[in-house]
């Protein structure tokens, strides 16, 4: 959630952020009103409790003649306090709902507008000229790497089996990402893939896109769509030590997404699926270090993309395409020959203090005072990367060249029918 002090002092900046996202700026005024009403309700309840306490003291010291009137007043005050506390609870609920409804304030320079309003920051590599390219599914099936038919038989649409060297290719990607992360000071974590509602809400995934999340109703638990979620909850309600620098974690997990809003999109192959594996970088740092950490995360993603040897571009994602928690997001998109376009392989988001404020994750400043930490996240490898590898490294005879960095994991330089 956003910083209330910042909101009170800069309401126009928050309204502008809402507009750049395509969201309702009137929510800012609703929150300001709810904040004022909550503070008034707290003050009223506090004043009545103080009066009640003073009246109780008077009763103990009162003469027999004074006592009946004082007892009557004490009873009235008890009822008034009860009503004031109920009003305060109502005001708190209204305030919390209004606070949770506002997305993070976007960072200056983020392009305004929707999905197509991104800014291209860099383009790396030239797409190969491939005559009559095969798509990743045709290649994957011919090479015995991907089995969508049996995936659908077992689990339904958008599920699949990775088999043989297809499974080795994915495992190799994950291990490359783990190696890069641990070489750069990340702590490897294999987290739970089920989380409590307060953790899912704290990361910002139960807002407008709550229907994208799998929920186990009988247990009131959620399946994660990224290990960002459990890693954000890892230090919830804690004061962490950042005196030696940022805390960096790399989470390796299976991820689950309903893709409820994607009917008819990417129905072929493994570009958009319900289950996939991912290595996710997650960082806790001081707010003043967040921009530099964001650049570092992007740099590590680019190192990974260099290892799989595919053309890609880096974009500054438009405000209207950001998740509610992100203040800025960079995507790296790989060239997909059969689609003649770039598709997202990685994203990295600077969530500033938005998630940590919801989850009460703090650190101590140089004066020992607790402050809200900043959080960042970024993909280091995921199943979708197989799409870019297979399509960009396909050969005229239907084989696929294995990027050199993955050869030790796959056991061959060429995947052949």
Swiss-Prot record:
Keyword field contains Transcription regulation: no
Binding sites annotated in the UniProt record for L-serine: 226-228, 280, 379
E.C. numbers: 6.1.1.11
Gene: serS
Family: Belongs to the class-II aminoacyl-tRNA synthetase family. Type-1 seryl-tRNA synthetase subfamily.
Enzyme kind, highest EC tier: ligase
Stored InterPro entries: aa-tRNA-synt_IIb, aa-tRNA-synth_II, aa-tRNA-synth_II/BPL/LPL, Ser-tRNA-ligase_type_1, Ser-tRNA-synth_1_N, SerRS_1_N_sf, SerRS_core, tRNA-bd_arm
Key words of the record: Aminoacyl-tRNA synthetase, ATP-binding, Cytoplasm, Ligase, Nucleotide-binding, Protein biosynthesis
Domain remark in the UniProt entry: Consists of two distinct domains, a catalytic core and a N-terminal extension that is involved in tRNA binding.
Catalytic activity: tRNA(Ser) + L-serine + ATP = L-seryl-tRNA(Ser) + AMP + diphosphate + H(+); tRNA(Sec) + L-serine + ATP = L-seryl-tRNA(Sec) + AMP + diphosphate + H(+)
Localisation: Cytoplasm
Cellular component terms per the entry's GO annotation: cytoplasm
HAMAP family given in the database record: Ser_tRNA_synth_type1 (MF_00176)
A Pfam entry, by short name: tRNA-synt_2b
A Gene Ontology molecular function term of the record: serine-tRNA ligase activity
One record GO biological process: seryl-tRNA aminoacylation
Purpose of the protein: Catalyzes the attachment of serine to tRNA(Ser). Is also able to aminoacylate tRNA(Sec) with serine, to form the misacylated tRNA L-seryl-tRNA(Sec), which will be further converted into selenocysteinyl-tRNA(Sec).
Protein name in UniProt: Serine--tRNA ligase
Quaternary structure note: Homodimer. The tRNA molecule binds across the dimer.
Residue positions binding ATP: 257-259, 273, 344-347
Coiled coil: none
């Amino acid at each position: 959630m956003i910083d209330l002090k910042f909101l009170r002092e800069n309401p126009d900046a928050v309204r502008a952020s809402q507009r750049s996202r395509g969201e309702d700026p009137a929510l800012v005024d609703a929150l300001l009103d709810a904040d004022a009403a909550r503070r008034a309700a707290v003050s009223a309840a506090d004043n009545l409790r103080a009066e009640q306490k003073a009246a109780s003291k008077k009763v103990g010291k009162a003469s027999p003649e004074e006592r009946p009137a004082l007892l009557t007043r004490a009873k009235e005050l008890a009822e008034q306090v009860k009503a004031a506390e109920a009003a305060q609870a109502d005001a708190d609920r209204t305030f919390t709902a209004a606070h949770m409804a506002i997305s993070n304030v976007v960072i200056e320079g983020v392009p305004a507008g929707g999905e197509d309003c991104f800014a291209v920051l860099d383009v790396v590599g030239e797409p190969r000229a491939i005559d009559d390219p095969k798509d990743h599914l045709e290649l994957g099936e011919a090479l015995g790497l991907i089995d969508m038919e049996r995936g659908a038989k077992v689990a339904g649409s958008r599920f699949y089996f990775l088999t043989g060297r297809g499974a080795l290719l994915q495992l190799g990607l994950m291990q490359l990402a783990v190696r890069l992360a641990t070489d750069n000071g990340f702590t490897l974590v294999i987290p739970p893939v089920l989380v409590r509602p307060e953790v899912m809400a704290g990361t910002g995934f139960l807002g407008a896109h709550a229907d994208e999340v799998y929920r186990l109703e009988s247990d009131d638990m959620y399946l994660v769509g990224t290990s960002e979620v459990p890693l954000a909850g890892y230090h919830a309600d804690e004061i962490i030590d950042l005196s030696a620098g940022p805390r960096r974690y790399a989470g390796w997990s299976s991820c689950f997404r309903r893709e409820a809003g994607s009917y008819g999109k990417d129905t072929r192959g493994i570009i958009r699926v319900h289950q996939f594996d991912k290595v996710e970088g997650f960082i806790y740092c001081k707010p003043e270090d967040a921009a530099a950490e964001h650049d570092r995360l992007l740099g590590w993603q680019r190192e990974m993309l260099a290892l799989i040897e595919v053309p890609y571009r880096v974009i500054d994602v438009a405000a209207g395409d950001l998740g509610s928690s992100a203040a800025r997001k960079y995507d790296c998109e790989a060239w997909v020959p059969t689609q003649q376009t770039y598709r997202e392989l990685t994203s990295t988001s600077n969530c500033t203090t938005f998630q940590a404020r919801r989850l009460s994750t703090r650190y101590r400043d140089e004066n020992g005072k607790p402050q809200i930490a900043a959080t960042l996240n970024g993909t280091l490898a995921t199943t979708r990367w197989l799409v870019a590898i297979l399509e960009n490294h396909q050969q005229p005879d239907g084989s696929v060249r294995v990027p050199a960095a993955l050869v030790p994991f796959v056991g061959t330089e060429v995947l052949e029918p």
